[in-house]
Amino acid sequence: MESRREKNPMTEEESDGLIAARRIQRLSLHLSPSLTPSPSLPLVQTETCSARSKKLDVNGEALSLYMRGKHIDIQEKIFDFFNSRPDLQTPIEISKDDHRELCMNQLIGLVREAGVRPFRYVADDPEKYFAIMEAVGSVDMSLGIKMGVQYSLWGGSVINLGTKKHRDKYFDGIDNLDYTGCFAMTELHHGSNVQGLQTTATFDPLKDEFVIDTPNDGAIKWWIGNAAVHGKFATVFARLILPTHDSKGVSDMGVHAFIVPIRDMKTHQTLPGVEIQDCGHKVGLNGVDNGALRFRSVRIPRDNLLNRFGDVSRDGTYTSSLPTINKRFGATLGELVGGRVGLAYASVGVLKISATIAIRYSLLRQQFGPPKQPEVSILDYQSQQHKLMPMLASTYAYHFATVYLVEKYSEMKKTHDEQLVADVHALSAGLKSYVTSYTAKALSVCREACGGHGYAAVNRFGSLRNDHDIFQTFEGDNTVLLQQVAADLLKRYKEKFQGGTLTVTWSYLRESMNTYLSQPNPVTARWEGEDHLRDPKFQLDAFRYRTSRLLQNVAARLQKHSKTLGGFGAWNRCLNHLLTLAESHIETVILAKFIEAVKNCPDPSAKAALKLACDLYALDRIWKDIGTYRNVDYVAPNKAKAIHKLTEYLSFQVRNVAKELVDAFELPDHVTRAPIAMQSDAYSQYTQVVGF
Amino acid sequence: MESRREKNPMTEEESDGLIAARRIQRLSLHLSPSLTPSPSLPLVQTETCSARSKKLDVNGEALSLYMRGKHIDIQEKIFDFFNSRPDLQTPIEISKDDHRELCMNQLIGLVREAGVRPFRYVADDPEKYFAIMEAVGSVDMSLGIKMGVQYSLWGGSVINLGTKKHRDKYFDGIDNLDYTGCFAMTELHHGSNVQGLQTTATFDPLKDEFVIDTPNDGAIKWWIGNAAVHGKFATVFARLILPTHDSKGVSDMGVHAFIVPIRDMKTHQTLPGVEIQDCGHKVGLNGVDNGALRFRSVRIPRDNLLNRFGDVSRDGTYTSSLPTINKRFGATLGELVGGRVGLAYASVGVLKISATIAIRYSLLRQQFGPPKQPEVSILDYQSQQHKLMPMLASTYAYHFATVYLVEKYSEMKKTHDEQLVADVHALSAGLKSYVTSYTAKALSVCREACGGHGYAAVNRFGSLRNDHDIFQTFEGDNTVLLQQVAADLLKRYKEKFQGGTLTVTWSYLRESMNTYLSQPNPVTARWEGEDHLRDPKFQLDAFRYRTSRLLQNVAARLQKHSKTLGGFGAWNRCLNHLLTLAESHIETVILAKFIEAVKNCPDPSAKAALKLACDLYALDRIWKDIGTYRNVDYVAPNKAKAIHKLTEYLSFQVRNVAKELVDAFELPDHVTRAPIAMQSDAYSQYTQVVGF
Ligand SMILES: Cc1cc2nc3c(=O)[nH]c(=O)nc-3n(C[C@H](O)[C@H](O)[C@H](O)COP(=O)(O)OP(=O)(O)OC[C@H]3O[C@@H](n4cnc5c(N)ncnc54)[C@H](O)[C@@H]3O)c2cc1C
Ligand SMILES: Cc1cc2nc3c(=O)[nH]c(=O)nc-3n(C[C@H](O)[C@H](O)[C@H](O)COP(=O)(O)OP(=O)(O)OC[C@H]3O[C@@H](n4cnc5c(N)ncnc54)[C@H](O)[C@@H]3O)c2cc1C
């Protein structure tokens, strides 16, 4: 409830109880909702909201042109292909086993029939790869993830962690799906803490082989996509154990990646020593066959070590260009950041679909109304605007932020610039976790905002929520990823004080730290005019101020607590604070990108619509955290009140262009699919679906 | 993110950047999460959280004795019955059609084999009825709802809206499931706004019959439970149309309820004139067969009018003990409040199961740890405590509040006391909406808190969330119900000013209004000692202050806006504010009940544990709304900070008795069922489930 909480109404005008009371009884009359003793019809007249202010006339074409991705052609090709193949569309109800087969067939259809070959783009044109992923994800999210497992995880591990010999041997088979494969990192006992993995790969110099073993049940590889049914290979992450000539006899070289064949190329039988079980029914993504793998002395040739960052020679000597176990492991994991970029990007895609369905239906749906007048659209209720309009604004905000992330990632893949690598790493961790957490909550809000009809499976919220849910966990758990963002900020904070340079995205910290460490300006704290509150400078300053102060304070707290609690204890004592810092930072980055996008929009009316959304995004976030701002007198009480009023007003304004803003996502009916959100005759399409 | 937001850290000690920075780098080293370049092993030592303070020794038996419901015997009988009948247990994966058949068989088994007869308790012993509902709901939520449709909705409408002739004719058949039935109120176009229903029941004096008609597609009865497959009858809500002798020819007497046979008693064929379609696959509750009904001149005898509140004589004359259409409709709907009480109560049951699974697993699961020390339980992370401990405290809070609601409801059913009717009506609307919204969000938090293993269907969060989701919507949409609570408060506010009496639950408004309308006390606003913050008087005062102020202010705002916008417009302009008021009020009622429950607990150690939870509930809510309190200087900046610190500390304290608090719910493993939450050998039970 806190998000709707009126944090400030107490400063609202004082009441004259008696007069009010009389009127109140009459007011409450208009409300005659379900299952309640219902008073008589109201007598009071009303003016409906939508008549309240002049509506902005948005050039929809210009807006969608501005929003449109570069790779719309391949996306449309994908939509057309699946549209032409009803046999490849996922029905509303399907068993797990059938769903898995269908999903595999969808992938085969995409690659072998539609001729879309995602693998080549994984390395060479990531923007295109992500566009493909977004499109197939909206066909069925399971397909998006299945494709990601095959090309980005299994394929990606081979080309990014292996060397030329691996590429030569596996590229074509992975590309054309002859070599289906898995990415086997997680174990039953270790997910987030990958350094704790226990599977071993022991070098046997006699036979020139590695022996893969699962030392105990906790080390069973778990959740491995493609393992339960379709995979022929797995990239297995295991501790490399080398024989030594000292008393210990062996040496643990840390976690490395190995290609392990798990099923016979011809018979598809599980290979000897490999035990595969099915992880079973999941909350969602049941088109993906996640399995659990146990290895009993499975032998693989030495060549199957993915040896880009570390190699073992014929005689068992270890070589690497990188000095330490941790550097090597870091480099290994660093190559996999693309998965996270993809999830952030795909999550915005889900948010777009969900917001579109909820908003289109809320425009159509009417319920209650002023006495003796037609019922009103539920989107005219202030509460419905509160549920959906900041969400619509946020969708735009995240759109621009993730497009930027994808660009940066592509650039990084080309230049391998070190600064950029660090930047993309933290940005992808932050955006992935922030956006997926938001979308997960938004999906529930959308379902609820559509009432009973939102609960029909055909209207999509259920499967979208169930499929998307795990975006918060895989490719790095959100709570863990945010800590990486916080750690990165602290590192840069330190650099700043040592006079180092700060990278592009974060540079505001450098510029602003000094300003923000001083007390808030008591004069501007009182400015409450709309022009001021809608000034990007005020908004950005407020976000940056908050981040800078959070950073400075947590640094001090960490320092204090580490004296008594040690590093681990101090970090834990400040953990909520650190997570807040990370989120605050990400919100700041998102706002900066949104402001830039508004500025660069060439069409004036489109720009005006974006500006409304951007202001709503900014002020809604400030209002949500008004306690922080009030507590240090960054805003005075009346300014807080003005921010709240303006937020409600902007929600109402955005409602007036909601249709245009949603249309600009250019999601055709065959992508949104929910009958209640069809662009024409929604009700009759809905009744048809159930058989009338 | 707002809930974790550090609203106050800026007042934390100022930093010495340089020293801090050096330490920070070391601190950040301990963090080596998945898929990221991971730094070297940390060197700093740590003290784990759980060693920080002395643990309270809770007498678990005393605590569970205090928590235990009166009707544990019948609940155990139900559990035992289903335990002994594996054929009646719902498998993880099941098709919609099979699920519906199974669900019907579960109900038949319960009634005819286990001999549990819920129908007699609907009217005579509601507490027992709700206990049965809770127990069957934890077997399968679909069964709980299916049972509710049969006995509380269909059966309840017959006995509560009908008269002796209906009871005599239908009681036994409903009781023994020969007369399966539906409650057909909602239409495609009208859910919350039931006064807008369009189905008609026209009296035909020639044949002494009513003719039921669906005038247009928007009037198709929709979402009707039991209609798609099993129902033989439906209580249909339709506008009663009577012939008149004036020029209009007919008169619309408003919505009434009629018993309409929809399927043949022998052949089970749909009867002539009735068209039934299947609403299809839903987000959850797929064991319930919701259908859509269209009527084409379906004739029923005059006796089928449920005539308790209004009757039609042989010659078409209308009689009623109640004066107006609205009074009659109100009385009709008022009889159905039990469904809402049941949902609030059942929702707490779901929350208990979900919190139990998440907390038991969080105690077991270990991930990361201080350097060279064993990994720690994830419940030792401050962030995990933040996710789950206020939730555990809230579960206790809602437990006591809904137990109270059920008691009041039973009393009301016995006494029919008018004051109590009004009280129960508002309280059930408020608690139903507040608790179900909370539980819906909590289920997502629990899934996420359990990481990947929380996503295995077998661990329950998916089905619990999907099934529970609609609790927010049916039996009255939450956003609509909260408005009823607000309207009720405004009504009482008015009564107060007219010198009327306030009923029990709300009486604090009477007592406190005068105090709270004055300015906050600048002295107590600065008190920040733990004793003060944990004093129930401070906590209740803070909650009541907020509610009183919100009420007073919204009354004034409504008065102001109604001048220009009319009643409907003014209400809408203040809608967010009104919803906040309603929530604030409900939170206050919940806190008062919790404080009372702590006070009355006979065992000192159990009492101490409850006190921890109660303080956490109270302070967490105050902190969530700290902006409001700060803005009117109800709390000074340092007090705000103290509240935040104490909240984190209490989360940690509650964590230390989390096992005991969860155990006291007395949910046996065969009820929680999630392998990851088994009370012993959870991991090995989990591996067994997937086939190892
Ligand atoms: C559908 C699905 C598909 C998957 N596919 C693959 C795959 O193909 N290959 C593969 O290798 N893996 C795969 N995974 C595994 C996935 O990567 C892991 O689930 C993920 O890394 C999280 O690890 P975990 O589940 O062990 O959670 P844990 O690490 O056990 O986390 C559990 C909880 O503890 C909290 N927590 C943990 N550490 C900390 C900390 N330091 N501070 C605060 N809180 C903490 C987390 O926030 C989380 O809420 C898949 C998982 C699923 C569910
Ligand atoms: C699984 C299931 C089982 C059901 N079983 C039955 C049954 O057996 N019998 C039966 O008769 N019905 C049944 N229903 C219908 C149920 O009672 C309705 O769905 C419910 O009353 C809500 O109505 P609605 O769906 O039309 O939502 P709407 O009233 O259309 O509401 C849609 C949205 O608009 C918002 N809204 C509406 N009015 C206002 C307002 N005044 N102010 C602010 N916001 C507003 C709501 O908050 C909601 O978010 C069932 C529904 C489902 C999904």
Curated annotation (Swiss-Prot), chains A, B:
Its main location: other. Its EC number is 1.3.3.6. It holds the Pfam family ACOX. It catalyses: a 2,3-saturated acyl-CoA + O2 = a (2E)-enoyl-CoA + H2O2. The keyword Coiled coil does not apply. The keyword Oxidoreductase applies. The active site is at E475. Its cofactor is FAD. One of its GO terms (biological process) is long-chain fatty acid metabolic process. InterPro entries: ACO, ACOX_C_alpha1, Acyl-CoA_Oxase/DH_mid-dom, Acyl-CoA_Oxase/DH_mid-dom_sf, Acyl-CoA_oxidase, Acyl-CoA_oxidase_C, AcylCo_DH-like_C, AcylCoA_DH/oxidase_NM_dom_sf. Binds 1 FAD per subunit. Coiled coil: none annotated. It is found in: Peroxisome. Induction: Induced by dehydration and abscisic acid (ABA). One of its GO terms (cellular component) is peroxisome. Residues 1-49 form a transit peptide. Transmembrane segments: none annotated. Gene3D superfamilies: Butyryl-CoA Dehydrogenase, subunit A, domain 2 (2.40.110.10), Butyryl-CoA Dehydrogenase, subunit A, domain 3 (1.20.140.10). Belongs to the acyl-CoA oxidase family. Homodimer. Catalyzes the desaturation of long-chain acyl-CoAs to 2-trans-enoyl-CoAs. Active on substrates longer than C14 and mostly with C18-CoA. Activity on long-chain mono-unsaturated substrates is double than with the corresponding saturated substrates. This is Acyl-coenzyme A oxidase 2, peroxisomal. It comes from Arabidopsis thaliana (Mouse-ear cress). The gene is ACX2.
